[in-house]
């Protein structure tokens, strides 16, 4: 086991400059070399079992409508939602970039901070690890907007039907790692959730000693330091209008 650990570390050291070079050439996330180095350092130490492996099943388990309109924000999972959820649910996706066509999914290019949707339109909204990027300059070509996430939450509230639910996941922890991710804590979420009813909250934290994710109390998740703990924690919320 010790030999495997040493070999893994050596492999990561060898791979690192090539990972950075690929990111710098593509520039599909960060634009500056400094930021791409930071992102590569974080990615190399990322858990084998990634946060999306928990977020997607969590969202699918908790969605409780059988029919109606669903909107997925920052979507990369329109196909999965269409394939897994009841067929009487109309799947809509919203993304600031062009999306690959998905049969049976209505795709809209736009910004969740300000949309053309009518008020009280959607029965539920999913926003999976997207809120933390809104208005954070330096990644995905986003322009700085200090209150971008607040604007997004207000717009989602506007377009949700009364009684409709928002299924939201965000990185959780003690300190932002900009421009990679904004991290949330109780103080931030309480401001963002103003007007919503908090129906459910869960927190997951990566245990670097054993390489597993654990369900933890909010206070434990809030103490997470990304670089020290090898990854951020996750906050998973069900909110109702």
Q: What feature does the model see in each segment?
A:
Residues 143-162:
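A short glycine-rich, Lys/Arg-flanked "PGG" loop and its adjoining helix->strand segment in the class I
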Residues 113-126:
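A short acidic, Gly/Pro-enriched loop at the edge of an enzyme's catalytic core
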Residues 69-114:
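Class I SAM-dependent methyltransferase SAM/SAH-binding core
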Residues 181-203:
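Short alpha-helix
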Residues 124-130, 136:
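A short beta-strand submotif of the Rossmann-like class I SAM-dependent methyltransferase core
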Residues 214-241:
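Core SAM-dependent methyltransferase catalytic element
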Residues 8-64:
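Class I SAM-dependent methyltransferase Rossmann-like catalytic core
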Residues 163-171:
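Conserved beta-strand signature within the Rossmann-like core of class I S-adenosyl-L-methionine
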